């Protein structure tokens, strides 16, 4: 039976799926049919359905948080359907800090390891002890340790070897008792009093000032990854674009700000149908309605082409795009 997907993903394109299933307990996974095509979903804050989906959308809605105190840290075991920001907030209220840089990131806990969420100098991988998942083929529950998750920048094994083969059920986080603030980004450096609560509140204030609320103005958050380029490439760019924001990423690479690249290409406020490059934050695309998946694809390609022609950098979308039966990747053909 057809089910609307418009309220199930925050970009809110008009679309529907053939069947919709909500998983409230893990026993359901053992009897659930995973006949392709199927799409696993949390809160849909990093997913856009471009067209009607011909398969089954399976939403993880399991709940539960367990806290175990150990000698030097707290082990936090969280069900996949829990809201991420609510977890951060509730842990801080219990005087268990560590995740405050990741406050207000939308979505569920189960979706967080898939793309190794990160913000303001901190990535989730720093705190993951292990991830439990349901093996779709074998119908068994298994566990991966941190190294086995193969975390990278907005990346993990769940995007590759275990893509469409695993359903994350529980995430185990280890939060050290000795709090070590990460203040490397912008406004956090200006804090008068450095406390977990102060960092938490500043991160929320900063995100609210830059990012529109997806439930009042549909969007999928940061749409493009910040490109990682070689030190040599950065040096060449800085000779022409001296104010290009960049951050060291390992010994041989730097990360550059995708939002700055888009803004400097003159694309703030650029619009195709009801889809617009947000006027306050160029890294965000917003949907004013009356838009189709084809409009979003055209916008992505226009941004990629504009940035590539100016900086010789091809932007990669961070948001997961779903067409009628599978995930897809959009890349503009660079002009020779």
From Swiss-Prot:
Subcellular location: Cytoplasm
Species, as recorded: Pseudoalteromonas translucida (strain TAC 125)
GO molecular function, one term: UDP-N-acetylmuramate dehydrogenase activity
One GO CC term on file: cytosol
PROSITE patterns per UniProt: FAD_PCMH
Similarity-based family: Belongs to the MurB family.
Catalytic activity: UDP-N-acetyl-alpha-D-muramate + NADP(+) = UDP-N-acetyl-3-O-(1-carboxyvinyl)-alpha-D-glucosamine + NADPH + H(+)
Pathway entry: Cell wall biogenesis; peptidoglycan biosynthesis
InterPro entries (UniProt xref): FAD-bd_PCMH (IPR016166), FAD-bd_PCMH-like_sf (IPR036318), FAD-bd_PCMH_sub1 (IPR016167), FAD-bd_PCMH_sub2 (IPR016169), MurB (IPR003170), MurB_C (IPR011601), MurB_C_sf (IPR036635), Oxid_FAD_bind_N (IPR006094)
Protein's recorded name: UDP-N-acetylenolpyruvoylglucosamine reductase
EC number from the UniProt entry: 1.3.1.98
Key words, A-Z: Cell cycle, Cell division, Cell shape, Cell wall biogenesis/degradation, Cytoplasm, FAD, Flavoprotein, NADP, Oxidoreductase, Peptidoglycan synthesis
Function of the protein: Cell wall formation.
HAMAP family membership: MurB (MF_00037)
């Amino acid at each position: 039976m057809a089910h609307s997907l418009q309220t199930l993903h925050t970009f809110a394109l008009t679309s529907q799926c053939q069947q919709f299933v909500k998983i409230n307990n893990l026993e359901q996974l053992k009897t659930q049919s995973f006949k392709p095509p199927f799409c696993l979903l949390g809160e849909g804050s990093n997913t856009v359905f471009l067209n009607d989906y011909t398969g089954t959308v399976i939403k993880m809605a399991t709940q539960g948080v367990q806290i175990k105190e150990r000698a030097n840290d707290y082990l936090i075991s969280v069900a996949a359907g829990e809201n991420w920001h609510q977890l951060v907030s509730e842990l801080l209220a219990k005087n268990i800090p560590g995740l405050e840089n990741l406050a207000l990131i939308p979505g569920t806990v189960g979706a967080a390891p898939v793309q190794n969420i990160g913000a303001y100098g901190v990535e989730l991988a720093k705190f993951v002890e292990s991830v439990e998942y349901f093996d779709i083929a074998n119908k068994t529950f298994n566990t991966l340790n941190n190294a086995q998750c193969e975390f990278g920048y907005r990346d993990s094994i769940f995007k590759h070897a275990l893509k469409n083969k695993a359903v994350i059920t529980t995430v185990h986080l280890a939060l050290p008792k000795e709090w070590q603030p990460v203040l490397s980004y912008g406004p956090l450096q200006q804090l008068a009093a450095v406390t977990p609560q102060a960092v938490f509140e500043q991160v929320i204030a900063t995100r609210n000032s830059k990012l529109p609320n997806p439930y009042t103005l549909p969007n999928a958050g940061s749409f493009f990854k910040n490109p990682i380029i070689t030190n040599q490439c950065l040096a060449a760019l800085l000779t022409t674009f001296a104010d290009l924001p960049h951050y060291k990423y390992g010994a041989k690479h730097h990360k550059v700000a995708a939002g700055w690249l888009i803004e400097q290409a003159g694309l703030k406020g650029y619009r195709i149908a009801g889809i617009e490059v947000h006027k306050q934050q160029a890294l965000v695309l917003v949907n004013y309605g009356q838009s189709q998946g084809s409009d979003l694809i055209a916008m992505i390609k226009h941004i990629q082409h504009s940035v590539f022609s100016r900086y010789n950098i091809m932007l990669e979308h961070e948001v997961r795009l779903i067409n009628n039966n599978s995930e897809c990747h959009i890349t503009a053909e660079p002009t020779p």
